[in-house]
Amino acid sequence: MMAQYLALKAEAQDCLLFYRMGDFFEMFFEDARIAAACLDIALTGRGEHDGERIPMCGVPVHAATAYLQRLIKAGHRVAIAEQTETPEAAKKRGGSKALVARAIVRVVTAGTLTEEALLDARAANWCVAVGEAGGDVAVAAADVSTGRFEIFETDMAGLGATLARLNPAEVVASEASEIDATSHRPRAQFDSAAGEARLKSLYGVATLDGFGQFSRAALSAAGGLVAYLDHTAKGALPFLRPPVLHAGDASMAIDAATRESLELTLATGGTRKGSLLDAVDRTVTGAGARLLAQDIAAPLMDAGAIGARLDLVQRFHDEPNLRETLRSSLRALPDIGRALGRIVAGRGSPRDLGQLRDGLDAAWALGERLHQLAAPPPLLAEIAPRLQGHGALIDLLKRALVPEPPIDAAGGGYIAEGFDAALDDLRHTGAGGRRAIAALEADYRKRTGIAALKIRHNGVLGYHVEVPARAADALMAPDSGFTHRQTLAGVVRFNAADLHEAAMQVTQAGNHALAAEASHLEDLTETALARRHEIAITADALARIDVAAGLAERAAEGGWARPALVDHACFEVEGGRHPVVEAAVARAGGRFVANDCDLSESSRLWLVTGPNMGGKSTFLRQNALIAVLAQAGSYVPATRAKLGLVDRLFSRVGASDNLARGRSTFMVEMVETAAILAQATPRSFVILDEVGRGTSTYDGLAIAWAVVEAIHEDNRCRCLFATHYHELTRLAERCEALSLHHVRAREWKGELVLLHELATGPADRSYGLAVARLAGLPPATIARAKSVLAKLEAGRAKTGGLAAGLDDLPLFAAVAAQEAEAVDELRTALAGIDVDALSPREALDALYRLKGLAG
């Protein structure tokens, strides 16, 4: 056995090997140590190898999915070695000592999951391959749970943005590539000619022209991905729809840093909660949620396609009764896309067929409702017919399956009564046999006088009589009619001729019934598979309707407006809000302050000043998010919006050290800013916050100054630039398209009041000390800062130099000494108070004295 295991382990390579032994998957050697630690299960031993005990652990087959989930989340890949014959077949083949044949039937990886329990219902699960050829780069992406297959042509500079858009579970590349990948595969699998042949074979075509014009890099990526999926499925290739080829300019370009900064689909920490997607998502199906995430990750550049999406959202927005009817119907839908994916992968169950039946039937009813609409929007008129056309399959599945089919087909019981007369007869025969066995139990009790006698069944003995050990002697007599089979602690088991006869009737009928059901299941599966492409199209149509209805619901909730999209590079937003922050403020019982933004040609660059916590960063981000939502086909959080299409979106807001790559916060900021200056076009939208911080004041100011000039003169894009360098406001004198704005704040009775309102002109002051006091800095520190600030401002007024006057500030200034004396006096006063002896009036007087000492 161990020789067989080692041979399979060599085939599994770097995967953990689940080796099937009866009702368990066993692991040995280093695999056992890794799995035991990861799964928190006992590490035992079995036999010896090279003179040492073999480490071993195992998990039950029936619970394997839960253990697989933990291993995959921990970053492992798992090869499944199943028994490919029964022990009886092995004995017939090679005698009583023959080893049961085993083979690896599947490699489970993060990107190739289809099991419902292992997947997030509301997120796509992409497995991607990166192909390179002649300096070009392409990414092929497949979600094997639904069959989506998409190809993106890019270059090395844009690879990161493409991968960030997909957020893949697994990345595969050639072993000759330097790309950071989850798995590197043989170079030959990424050969473009081999890739073309592999795709032609997969789709049974002589040419790929019907799918588009593929570059060599695209063929390399697609071929490499198909080869990898074939490897993990061990020849049972999962369902892949015809590939969709994406041109580089079909969607808004958003790099990885911008996605992270704006938290489009994932918030800080890698979770959905707190992201734009989380704030917008009102979908009621898993497929709708996955499609919405895709829409937000890749906003469109085609004004016509955006308008078609918006028309559909508007129809549902303007007709709340229709919207609620649709959402109520959609809410009850099963995920037919993923059910189909499991069926195609050979991992389908009777329940998956039941989900197809119920989902397609509900889709048909939904289509009937939509056909009644007068003047439907063009997109709805296009997709509504896709909801129907499955009548014959629905009728077959309705007749064939019970209302709630089981997940496990092994026990039968999923074919409906009346579908197959012969199967019904077998079931009646089996039921008759079970009634006969029940009658025998009553008869045996009467004959023997043993009230505790029971007829039981297990996989080893079959049907048998079981009595307490104290009553077994009565059945041991030769003329009792019972044959002893097994003695256990407390019970003794017997057989009887008439029981054996009845049991044979039940067993044979049951086996024949199971075989008949399995045959029907195979036929039903083949019938469904014949319509897999049409079913996938229906699933897509349902998802699009769910997305539109959900966006309409969100717009109605928040009073959002339909954006107007124009050809020229304008950006006019009235009453704009940040959807995530607004929701958080509302939960806290507050009210979000809306602001306008008008980046017309004459003021396409706004320089925004004002105090920290005043709302500058929120204002910058909210306008970037409005652009994303508009081009995704959504209403936007504003009272009015008129936007020119944005080809590239950049955000340099907030940064942190990238220690893994040896980059400081300032270095990260400069790299991101350099990318913006190199890539932004006049149609781009850029938000920049505090460029230049992290270095000396003069260096930072000089960099910020030069960046503003470059964006104004060279990139000429729409830009919101927030800064604390008030010196930059002088650029308004020489940059005709630069407009000055600030977030308003006021001091009231010594306290800072942040108004979160945007006003024209520069801020009159930074309010830095007020914000520091609001943040809780010690009074002594605030006082010292005031002293330093006064000297700095005096020096600046006298010499024009920022550092003038610093020489007059000793490390331990007089104010600090005075405050130290005040602290000592306060301590002395506190030490002289006998708290237990004070009356309430005396305590209040003492408190006032102490307050006077504290100033």
Q: Language-model segments: which ranges?
A:
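A conserved P-loop NTPase coupling/switch region
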Residues: 24-45, 138, 148-150, 170, ...
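ATPase nucleotide-binding head domains, primarily ABC-like/P-loop NTPase cores
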Residues: 29-32, 215, 284, 289, ...
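Conserved phosphate-binding elements of NTP-dependent enzyme cores
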Residues: 3-7, 14, 525, 539-543, ...
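C-terminal tails and terminal domains of large nucleic-acid-associated
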Residues: 823-855
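Amphipathic alpha-helical transducer elements in NTP-driven molecular machines
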Residues: 2, 18, 29, 58-68, ...
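Basic, polar low-complexity surface loops/patches
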Residues: 1-318, 335-341, 345, 403, ...
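Short hinge/gating elements
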Residues: 44-57, 82, 204-214, 263-266, ...
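Amphipathic heptad-repeat alpha-helical coiled-coil/stalk segments that mediate oligomerization
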Residues: 193-197, 202, 252-253, 258, ...
